[in-house]
């Protein structure tokens, strides 16, 4: 079954370490990113990015795994 919405939540716990790398991945995988929303949470020392992805399943999995491998980054998924 093909999903209509695949949402990734990215919590950047260490923005001084991870922000640039997350941004590079977002740019590199721009063809599968349909929508993104960033929420700055200074009181938590980081921020959240919500990303709606679409396209090739292999590319989506690679994007998720590369994000999850970054130090200071936590990745969660919602699939509808």
Describe these PLM feature segments.
Residues 1-80:
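Long, contiguous binding/interaction regions
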């Amino acid at each position: 079954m093909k999903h209509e919405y695949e949402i990734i939540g990215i919590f950047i716990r260490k923005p001084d370490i991870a922000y640039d790398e997350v941004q590079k991945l977002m740019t590199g995988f721009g063809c599968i990113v349909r929508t993104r929303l960033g929420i700055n949470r200074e009181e938590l020392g980081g921020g959240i990015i919500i990303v709606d992805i679409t396209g090739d399943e292999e590319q989506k999995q690679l994007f998720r795994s590369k994000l999850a491998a970054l130090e200071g980054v936590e990745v969660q998924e919602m699939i509808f």
